[in-house]
Amino acid sequence: MNFENLYAAALALMSIGAAGALAAGKRPALSQVIGCAGLISGIIVSAISVCAGLPDYVNLFRIPILILGLAGVWFSPQYLKGHGSQRSGIYYFFFNLTVAAMLGVTIMNRPIPFLVMWEIMGLASFALVAFDYKSRQVARAAWIYLLACQAGGMVLLGMFLMASSVEAFFILAVIGFGLKIGFPLLHVWLPEAHPAAPAPVSALMSGAMIQLGFYGIWRWGINAVASYSEMFGFTLIALGIICCLGGIILSFPRTNIKTLLAYSSIENMGIISLGCGLGLLGLGKGNVTMIFCGFAGAGLHMLNHALLKGGLFLLAGSVQKATGSLEMEKMGGLLKRMPVSGSLFLLNSAGLSGLPPFNAFVSEFLIYLAGFAAFTVPGKPLFMVAGVAVPVVLALTGGLAAAAFCKVGGAVFLGEPRSKEAAEAVEVPLSMRLPVLLLFLCGCAVTVLTPAAARLFAPEEWIQELYPAIRALQMVAVTSLAVTGLFVLLVLIKGLLPRGKEIRRSCTWDCGFSKPDARMEYTGSAFIQPLVFFCGRLTGAKRKITHPQGSFPEKSSFEEESADPGMEFFWEKSFKFFFRLAAKLNFLQSGYLHFYILIMTAALVLMLVWGFLLPWAGTLMKGGF
């Protein structure tokens, strides 16, 4: 079977659906049907190719694209009602185009087609981020995202042009693909773009698109640096540690649900980076356990993150649909009003924190094993340091993530409503709940099927050496399944037990207050305040306190705002420098056509000189693309 033809057919179906949705834009219902039909048919054809083909690491990137594309297009019709449904033709055009381009990125095997698909993916998703373009905040977020996409594309072009230098190639790969992943200082677009984009788009971008940065590193970077694998392995581990701790710490003071989830995505990209780094160290040393557990743990965590984080972003959209807001301090008590969505949010949050028996624990367990294997490598002190640092960071990150998600769960779903909108919220339609349930059930299936998949992907000659790791993985999967089954059984038994007497329901004990008010309960910010105070300026939080004065003080206040330290201390200063530089170059805009032609001619001459007089550049330009 020719799988390339199947993928080409899938891209064609998605593109036809996109064009049809745009053409029928004046009839929103028709454009919705055409767009959904084109995307779903393309996903089905792609899924046939994935299932019928041989086991391939690329499928770890294709499966999230297909699953989240399906969940997103399933979720979108009800979500768009009252949220831009009259522009559904434009929405489905760019949504289909984004999914098709993401799939195309995983198909293209040569630099130029790969870069073309990469650019289409960035531009199409930019249009989706800017869907509510009339909002000043959305417009700002969209332009920041577009700048990041274009900067990443330029760096990747330079990466391919510098293919003769291994060091430069990998460094540019880390920067170019790191802009998509959200590596330190390259992450600033994530907390801006995700809150601005529609919820299905945020789910697709966070769950599948940013992980394509790792596909780029795996596809183009790792093969090129086999002889330098130790050095670059430590580089990825260092970046992973900063992402893990920095991402989750920066999430603490955030009050917007999707902003917090965006920082959580940075943390999870750090976990994947740790696995990739340990795998590279294993390549340099020839350690089979490190290679397999590192790369397998990273790949499996990509899939788990896609399922869990995609579900959480969709649930954030459900909350926004029900309350009209994403500010968690305006919510409260939604678990009573949205029991299915609230329960799924809490379950996905526990899973993403890496707690057993959920699926993310299984992938992190593999990375733990890779770290323990690094500690036992003889004669390598730095390997021992990595073997200690990685498990410690993973454990610490899991605890901090649990605290961050406790903040969200408590502020949004527990307690009493803090606004009229939260008090009047109702459960979202079934078509918005089923996609999230599908993602969660897929995550449960991943937990059970991981040991079998591990044996399938492991080379035959490695099976004997990997037997202890695979055996431990089987025990984790069986234990997780048993605990989950026991929990479900207890819930069913509780529901079936006869009740001897009627349960009296009354208000919560008010501790002596005659009229308790929602203002008296802890907010999410108050809950997480000890950790924010402990982490200090790392969280980006700034406080302004007006202390009471005099014997009869009239007023006092406490204000806290948070800014991303990377944006505040690096990018804003960098932008100011370039603005000043651009102002000094205004003289080039003389308004004379012949002067512009002279500049273009000079640039063309310089490109020709660079391309034909430099031997390595000429060779690359003639045969490398």
PLM features: residue spans?
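Interfacial loop-to-helix junctions that mark the boundaries of transmembrane helices
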Residues: 1-6, 54-61, 110-112, 226-235, ...
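Hydrophobic membrane-spanning alpha-helices of multi-pass integral membrane proteins
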Residues: 240, 341, 348, 432-447, ...
